[in-house]
Regions:
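Conserved A3 ("GATE") glycine/threonine-rich loop of ANL adenylate-forming enzymes
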Residues: 77-78, 138-148, 253
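C-terminal substrate-binding/cap subdomain adjacent to the FAD-binding core in PCMH-type
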Residues: 147-149, 156-160, 167-368
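Glycine-rich, histidine-containing beta strand-loop boundary motifs that form or position
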Residues: 27, 72-76, 83, 114, ...
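N-terminal flexible segment immediately upstream of the FAD-binding catalytic core
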Residues: 1-65, 75-108, 137, 160, ...
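Hydrophobic side chains in well-ordered alpha-helices
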Residues: 10, 59, 121-124, 287-293, ...
Length: 368
């Protein structure tokens, strides 16, 4: 394949429907878009700042027609080079910031486009007493598209409230340009008619995985802990409906399966009180045993809305001697001869009475 010829033909085609001020091919701007938050760098040949899913659908079809690889990018806060490419980069940031609050009985869902920043979602939800469950460290700049596509979670939401568990439905653009909204019965029915074999293959794969008891058990076990390596296999054992499998497979796919143009997510209640503690231990073993003991007090994930009332320790992060020494914490320096490990523990959220009880119970466990 003659790449330069394909690129020229591709550019000629997309310039018919994408304004030239949103297409970058010059050396300076392509260089600028050639890196993310990782240490990788690849200079894209073409950068397109997209504006709407119909436009993305046409761009994707053009890429496929001219056999050009393409990569999607939101904020570019990824640490592993997911949004770097040396071919076509399709950016979904500006112009992708719409949202809609959806009441679902006593709970709230929120419909989000991929270009809205995670922290902005929490600003929107705060007056409603709700919170966006995923909380990656980069939430102040990471956008919803990247958070969901990477199944980013952060320290506090663990696996019980990550993007996969909180996703309700997704609106996606497939590599053939087809737009599918898994939350719309009309869209699902149209997809059944246009892609029957696609759905049949997903159902056959689902049945094949479930028929292998050892594989099924291994998948269930793997996704009880943080596991974002490779494509998301949990939907094959967690959902029967092929459309649910499609939607949840997008989570963690890093843009390799489809373009995520909209996602509907559950929200959780935002409680007013939280507590944190820095705990020190004589050995890594003691710290590990404390984590196990605290985990035994954590609520299950069956009903997230109710479990928040019973949650004792929400998260615990271990620090070894080297990391403690690097901080030069005054308390640690005072006891550095005896201390070998530390735990940062977060309790709550909850009301004041509930949180006081949590603190007392946690102190009892860690002293034992």
């Amino acid at each position: 394949m003659n790449y330069e010829l394909s690129k020229r033909q591709f550019l000629a085609e997309i310039k018919r429907f994408v304004p030239k001020d949103r297409i970058y091919t010059d050396e300076l701007r392509t260089l600028g878009w050639g890196t993310d938050a990782s240490f990788y760098r690849q200079t894209p040949q073409v950068v397109i700042r997209s504006d709407g899913e119909e436009e993305v659908s046409r761009i994707v079809r053009a890429c496929r027609k001219h056999r050009l690889p393409f990569t999607f990018r939101a904020a570019g806060t990824s640490l592993s080079g997911q949004s770097c490419t040396d071919s076509v980069l399709i950016v979904a940031g500006k112009h992708w910031e719409r949202y809609e609050i959806i009441e679902q009985g006593e709970s709230l869902h929120i419909k989000l486009q991929p270009g809205i920043v995670g922290a902005r979602v929490n600003e929107i939800l705060k007056p409603l007493g709700r919170v966006f469950p995923p909380d990656p460290a980069s939430i102040g700049s990471a956008m919803v598209g990247g958070i969901v596509n990477n199944n980013a979670s952060g320290m506090n939401c663990g696996v019980h409230a990550n993007s996969d568990r909180m996703l309700v439905s997704a609106r996606i653009v497939l590599t053939d340009g087809t737009i599918l909204d898994t939350g719309s019965e009309a869209s699902r029915e149209a997809f059944r008619r246009s892609h029957p074999e696609f759905l049949s293959r997903i159902e056959r794969l689902r049945d094949k995985v479930r028929a292998d008891e050892e594989l099924r058990a291994r998948i269930i076990k793997k996704y009880r802990i943080k596991n974002v390596t490779g494509l998301n296999l949990r939907p094959l054992v967690a959902y029967d409906d092929p459309f649910d499998i499609i939607a949840h497979s997008i989570v963690g796919s890093e843009g390799t399966l489809a373009f995520l143009s909209e996602v509907t997510m559950k929200t959780l209640r935002d409680y007013p009180y939280r507590a944190s503690a820095m705990l020190y231990f004589l050995s890594m073993r003691e710290a590990s045993e404390a984590v196990v003991a605290m985990k035994g007090l954590m609520a299950g994930e069956e009903d997230l809305e109710m479990s928040a009332e019973r949650l004792v320790v929400k998260s615990a992060e271990m620090l070894d001697y080297k990391s403690l020494s690097a901080v030069d914490d005054p308390v640690f320096l005072q006891y550095r001869q005896d201390v070998d490990a530390g735990l940062i523990a977060n309790a709550g959220p909850g009301d004041y009475r509930h949180l006081t009880a949590i603190i007392t119970e946690t102190k009892t466990i860690t002293h034992e």
